[in-house]
Amino acid sequence: MSCWTYLGRARGPRASAPTARRFFANFFNDLIVAVSSTVGALKTSQQTPLKMSQDMSHVPEAIRMVLIGPPGAGKGTQAPKLKEKFCVCHLATGDMLRSQVAKQTALGVQAKKIMDQGGLVSDEIMVNMIKDELRSNPECANGFILDGFPRTIPQAQKLDEMLVAQGKPLDRAVELKIDDELLVARITGRLVHPASGRSYHKLFNPPKVAMTDDVTGDPLVQRSDDNADALKKRLDAYHAQTEPIVDFYKKTGIWAGVDASQPPKTVWSDILKALGK
């Protein structure tokens, strides 16, 4: 019974002393119960959001980003860490293309036919492959890291159109910036585990056993194009392609640059700052 009911009773005919005593005894007993119940409800309502926030604390924030950088800038080091921290998919478009071809998907069959004829896979096919991965790959539910795409303004525009239509617009385009001279020193000493893509460096990040993968014990290889002359051509092509893309994302307001010449831990910290995490 509410206090308002008791107050309504109190306005009635005057009661005798024993009746009044019983009235007020019952009134205050019920009042204590009502107050206790209200306080308990308030405590529960205050604790519930806290408990929910604690339960959700292990769920990482979503990220949707493009990772830009020349060969040797450290994308292969940083992308797996981003994938693990934020529980997102890492879409290295070269790997994605090879996977679709190997699986003989409809898009993979189209791409293989074009490549077998010596042509370049169209922007439309590449964007549709990314769209397919975002839809079918459970790792992409919380976001994605795009690596190796886009490389041209039309690709960037088609990608943006598709992502906006999917309700998954890009949050950030992070560029790993580094001088070409340092890249030459890095890449000409690079060692790769072909099966996993793990990379090492003869000087900066040597394997525990020379020319041997730390995880599997398989032999490491040095890529045939990891030499100074081949690298210069790759860097020239990269700069010609990438500068317009960087300008495109600067204009959209989502670009952030990170100095990739720093130690990997510092680069990692700066990437998180660029993401606002």
Swiss-Prot record:
Region called NMP, residue ranges: 92-121
GO-annotated cellular components: cytoplasm; cytosol; mitochondrial intermembrane space; mitochondrion
UniProt EC number: 2.7.4.3
Alphabetical list of InterPro entries matching this protein: Adenyl_kin_sub, Adenylat/UMP-CMP_kin, Adenylat_kinase_CS, Adenylate_kinase_lid-dom, ADK_active_lid_dom_sf, AK2, P-loop_NTPase
Keywords: ATP-binding, Cytoplasm, Kinase, Mitochondrion, Nucleotide-binding, Transferase
Binding annotation for ATP: 72-77, 190, 199-200, 262
Cellular location(s): Cytoplasm, Cytosol; Mitochondrion intermembrane space
Gene3D superfamilies per the UniProt record, alphabetical: P-loop containing nucleotide triphosphate hydrolases
Residues binding AMP, per UniProt: 93, 98, 119-121, 148-151, 155, 223, 234
Main location class: cytoplasm
Listed PROSITE patterns: ADENYLATE_KINASE
HAMAP family per record: Adenylate_kinase_Adk (MF_00235), Adenylate_kinase_AK2 (MF_03168)
Protein name as it appears in the record: Adenylate kinase
